[in-house]
């Protein structure tokens, strides 16, 4: 019985000592993040698509906040995100990259030519929003509501059976962009 108590006490002391060491190390070696970069990162859509030229939303936020990168390079976020970043940084809004060609951007959707799909799962691994479903050596398909049209699934496909097609805006496919609607709080006078 005494050997059990010695083991319990020894493990408890080791846990306490290691906990104190980890607590000290977390405070001593803490990395302070730039609060502006954090706020910019919160505004970005977090699709990690790479259309801005950076490998994800966090590196783009760091480039905008610390290095003065253009605020108009986020294609999935569009004008709404660009306006929020401009307001946060107190800079003038800029036209979103690619807006010179089109007045209204067309939503793109990945489509898989299912008879040619070999089920290699490379597109599933490349999709940042998990919009592609399927099993190994089985046909894959794209969930239309989740696809952002980021084009990251096209290049890894060995059979070239994935293509991006434009989706026409119809009453069935149109959705509200709630972030583009300005919201104001109007004070209400209370009568006693």
Swiss-Prot record:
Its main location: membrane. One of its GO terms (molecular function) is electron transfer activity. Its EC number is 7.-.-.-. It is found in: Cell inner membrane. Binds 3 [4Fe-4S] clusters. Residues 108-137, 138-167 form the 4Fe-4S ferredoxin-type domain. GO terms for cellular component: plasma membrane. Residues 1-26 are annotated as: Hydrophobic. Its cofactor is [4Fe-4S] cluster. Residues 32-91 form the 4Fe-4S domain. [4Fe-4S] cluster 1 binds at residues 49, 52, 57, 74. SUPFAM superfamilies: 4Fe-4S ferredoxins (SSF54862). Coiled coil: none annotated. [4Fe-4S] cluster 3 binds at residues 127, 147, 150, 153. [4Fe-4S] cluster 2 binds at residues 117, 120, 123, 157. One of its GO terms (biological process) is electron transport chain. Keywords: 4Fe-4S, Cell inner membrane, Cell membrane, Electron transport, Iron, Iron-sulfur, Membrane, Metal-binding, Repeat, Translocase, Transport. It holds the Pfam family Fer4_21. The complex is composed of six subunits: RnfA, RnfB, RnfC, RnfD, RnfE and RnfG. Part of a membrane-bound complex that couples electron transfer with translocation of ions across the membrane. Belongs to the 4Fe4S bacterial-type ferredoxin family. RnfB subfamily. This is Ion-translocating oxidoreductase complex subunit B. The lineage of its organism: Bacteria, Pseudomonadati, Pseudomonadota, Gammaproteobacteria, Enterobacterales.
């Amino acid at each position: 019985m005494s050997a059990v108590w010695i083991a319990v006490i020894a493990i408890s002391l080791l846990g306490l000592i290691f906990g104190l060491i980890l607590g000290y190390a977390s405070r001593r070696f803490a990395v302070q993040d730039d609060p502006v970069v954090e706020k910019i990162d919160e505004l970005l859509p977090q699709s990690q698509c790479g259309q801005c030229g950076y490998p994800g939303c966090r590196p783009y936020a760091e480039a905008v906040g610390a290095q003065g990168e253009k605020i108009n390079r986020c294609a999935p976020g569009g004008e709404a995100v660009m306006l929020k970043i401009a307001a946060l940084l107190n800079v003038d809004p800029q036209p979103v990259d690619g807006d010179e060609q089109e007045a209204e951007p067309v939503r793109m959707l990945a489509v898989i030519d299912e008879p040619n799909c070999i089920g290699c799962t490379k597109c599933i691994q490349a999709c940042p929003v998990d919009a592609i479903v399927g099993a190994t050596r089985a046909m894959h398909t794209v969930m239309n509501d989740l696809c952002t049209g980021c084009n990251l699934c096209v290049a890894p496909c060995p059979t070239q059976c994935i293509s991006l097609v434009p989706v026409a805006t119809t009453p069935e496919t149109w959705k509200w962009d709630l972030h583009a609607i300005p919201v104001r709080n109007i004070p209400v006078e209370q009568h006693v």
